[in-house]
A protein has these predicted regions:
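PIN/NYN-family metal-dependent endoribonuclease catalytic core
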Residues: 5, 15-50
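A secondary-structure boundary/capping signal
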Residues: 6-7, 36-37, 106-107, 123-124
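Residues at secondary-structure transition points
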Residues: 18, 35, 57, 61, ...
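Short active-site oxyanion
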Residues: 31-34, 99-101, 118-119
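Active-site neighborhoods of divalent-metal-dependent phosphate/nucleic-acid chemistry enzymes
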Residues: 69-102, 108
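Acidic, PIN/NYN-like endoribonuclease modules and their adjacent C-terminal/linker elements
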Residues: 89, 108-136
């Protein structure tokens, strides 16, 4: 199963032990092929530095850990779908470029789409339920 996790899922997985954390554990265990793009990693760096005021060393360690679990795909920045928050377009384009089945998000701007072509936009809890059903 292939997926893209948006930045809020990645940040939640880093700091808390809820559903996003379990999604990241599934990727670490090889149950999920996780994909990111340079703009997603850049946003992760910005959020960790600006919002959480983490040291550059800690940020580098976290981003390195995400890179260790995920495959990085290049995007062009030409997808323009999310009218209410164009900065979310990078997640959709990454999902399309990586040909994933799921975009895991907690962002209502993305979740309202439900499906974008072949990509289903789901919450972390929904993704865990899907993973659980697929392993039975």
């Amino acid at each position: 199963m292939k997926a893209v996790f948006d930045t809020n899922i990645l940040v939640s997985a880093i700091f808390w032990r809820g559903s996003p954390y379990r999604c990241l554990l599934a990727a670490q265990a090889g149950l999920v092929e996780l994909y990111v793009s340079p703009p997603i990693l850049a946003e992760l760096v910005r959020v960790l530095q600006d919002k959480f005021q983490l040291s550059p060393e800690w940020v580098d360690e976290v981003v390195g850990a995400v890179r260790g679990v995920a495959r990085v795909v290049e995007i062009s920045g030409t997808v323009h779908v999310v009218v209410d928050d164009p900065s979310d377009d990078k997640f959709i384009e990454t999902a399309q470029m990586a040909n994933v089945e799921y975009l895991v998000s907690g962002d209502h701007h993305l979740l309202t789409y439900g499906e974008l072509g072949e990509v289903r936009v789901v919450t972390a809890r929904m993704f865990l339920d899907i993973l659980s059903q697929s392993s039975q």
